[in-house]
Amino acid sequence: MSETKVVRTLTGVVVSDKMDKTVTVLVERKVKHPIYGKIIRRSKKFHAHDENNEFKAGDLVVISESRPLSKTKSWVVTGLVEKSRQV
């Protein structure tokens, strides 16, 4: 009876890297308005663990759910999709 637990993963953009070993990731999703039918964007911010402080603002990253690491942090950055382009 060894059941594997499904791990939730999300993709988002790092909006803040000012904390030590933590980044703030903005995850956007598209939702259809229940009455008017227009597709609208909804977003939510997650604090994610970044052990080596390697991700910077603007990076597109993949985060996965984990055990609670602090009061507000229950996600871990698992991969980099795209580096931020510097202007």
From Swiss-Prot:
Family the entry assigns: Belongs to the universal ribosomal protein uS17 family.
GO MF, one annotated term: rRNA binding
One GO cellular component term: cytosolic small ribosomal subunit
Xref: InterPro entries: NA-bd_OB-fold, Ribosomal_uS17, Ribosomal_uS17_bact/chlr, Ribosomal_uS17_CS
Protein name: Small ribosomal subunit protein uS17
Keyword terms, alphabetized: Ribonucleoprotein, Ribosomal protein, RNA-binding, rRNA-binding
SUPFAM superfamilies: Nucleic acid-binding proteins (SSF50249)
PANTHER family (UniProt xref): 40S RIBOSOMAL PROTEIN S11 FAMILY MEMBER, SMALL RIBOSOMAL SUBUNIT PROTEIN US17M
Assembly and interaction partners: Part of the 30S ribosomal subunit.
A biological process term (GO) from this entry: translation
NCBIfam families: PRK05610.1 (NF004123), uS17_bact (TIGR03635)
Function comment: One of the primary rRNA binding proteins, it binds specifically to the 5'-end of 16S ribosomal RNA.
Species assigned in the record: Chromobacterium violaceum (strain ATCC 12472 / DSM 30191 / JCM 1249 / CCUG 213 / NBRC 12614 / NCIMB 9131 / NCTC 9757 / MK)
